[in-house]
Amino acid sequence: MRIFIDFNIKPTNYSKDSLLEFINMALHLGYRALVMEISSNEEAELIKSLSGKRVKLYTRYTILAHSPSELKKTSRKVRWTDLIIAECFNQETARIAAKLENIHAILIPPEKLSLINERQINSMKMKERPLEIKFMDIFYTQNLQNTIRLIAKYLISASSKIPIIISSGAKEPSEMRSPRDMIALFSILGLNQEKTLDMISKNPYSLIRRLA
């Protein structure tokens, strides 16, 4: 039985009631775990206090990495989260992110998927470093047609070599998407259905299990 995980929830409000709304929506949609973006130890403690048997909660901190030095400096400082994700905007930073031991996954905006070339894939493969793509980024891109072309060109090829994680990037419970919606979109874009299922279950679960 697959355990579906939304790997990227970005609450705009960290009150207990707001987080419970995300948990209830996760249950409704069929998720068993959420990975929630945080920026402080206080947020991390609140999220951990709400984690339960029905929906497990994990924390993540995303570094907006515009340079290797910025990425290295910030990743050394962050201590109060389960996972550190590097969102990369250029090739040099993406290559460093693939090598740093304290980076758990690499997030690439859809318009930057050309960064996932053979050299980058090989570096990520050696470290078993997953690639994350946000569902919401696809629909908020300025050029949807070009984004679809990039997904077809780079993501389908990479999916046979490195683990890929699809996340919602939802800021409100209403922005969350069901596993079925995720599968439908990426199947239309040309990804194998079984691999798409892995991207919202097996691949994020494998990463989370390493935290135990």
Question: What do these predicted ranges mean?
Answer:
Residues 60-62:
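Regulatory helix-to-disordered linker/tail regions at the edges of structured cores
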Residues 65, 86-88:
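Short beta-strand elements of ligand-binding domains
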Residues 1-34, 42-58, 69-81, 92-212:
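Charged catalytic cores and adjacent phosphate/nucleic-acid-binding surfaces used
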